[in-house]
């Protein structure tokens, strides 16, 4: 399934990619992730979700987060448009879950994430995301 247009615009703007067909990890990647919202960014797995609701909310699979917890680090990016949203590192995600701010819905195995989310994790442009979370420096206004 192709990525949502806004998700695609965001990942292109920040330089996230999927493994190329024929690469050693491509087949494993496609088996694990049926939707096109899983990427690589600066050597880290990155999950990008978008909410289309007036009051934004997202669902993120416990199974996927458990899988990613075996990695050194990863990003979870929650978008409200192609330009703005919130980003969370592995430790940020763990804090949100352990504090019960993100609650697991047992019926479907998804963490339910509702706004408001921490201002410290917010970004208002792909350039600001890159500067804030990747340490990249851009000339563009943020």
For each feature predicted by the language model, list its residue ranges:
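Compositionally biased amphipathic helical and low-complexity segments enriched in hydrophobic
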Residues: 41-42, 79-81, 105, 135
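Catalytic cores of nucleic-acid endonucleases
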Residues: 50-91
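Acidic-basic catalytic patches of nuclease active cores, encompassing PD-(D/E)XK
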Residues: 1-43
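Non-catalytic C-terminal interaction segments of nucleic acid-processing enzymes
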Residues: 2-5, 91-142
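Structural alpha-beta junctions
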Residues: 12-21, 70-75, 98-102
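Generic detector of well-ordered alpha-helical segments enriched in charged/polar residues
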Residues: 4-15, 65, 69, 94, ...
């Amino acid at each position: 399934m192709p990525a949502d247009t806004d998700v695609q615009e965001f990942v292109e703007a920040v330089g996230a990619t999927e493994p190329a067909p024929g690469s050693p990890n491509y087949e494993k990647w496609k088996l694990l992730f049926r939707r096109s919202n899983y990427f690589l960014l600066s050597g880290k797995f990155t999950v990008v979700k978008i909410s289309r609701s007036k009051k934004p909310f997202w669902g993120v699979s416990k199974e996927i987060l458990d899988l990613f917890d075996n990695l050194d680090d990863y990003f979870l990016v929650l978008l409200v448009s192609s330009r703005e949203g919130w980003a969370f590192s592995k430790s940020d995600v763990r804090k949100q879950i352990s504090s019960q701010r993100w609650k697991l819905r047992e019926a479907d195995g998804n963490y339910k994430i509702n706004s408001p989310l921490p201002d410290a994790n917010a970004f208002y442009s792909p350039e600001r995301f890159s500067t804030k979370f990747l340490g990249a420096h851009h000339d563009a206004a943020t």
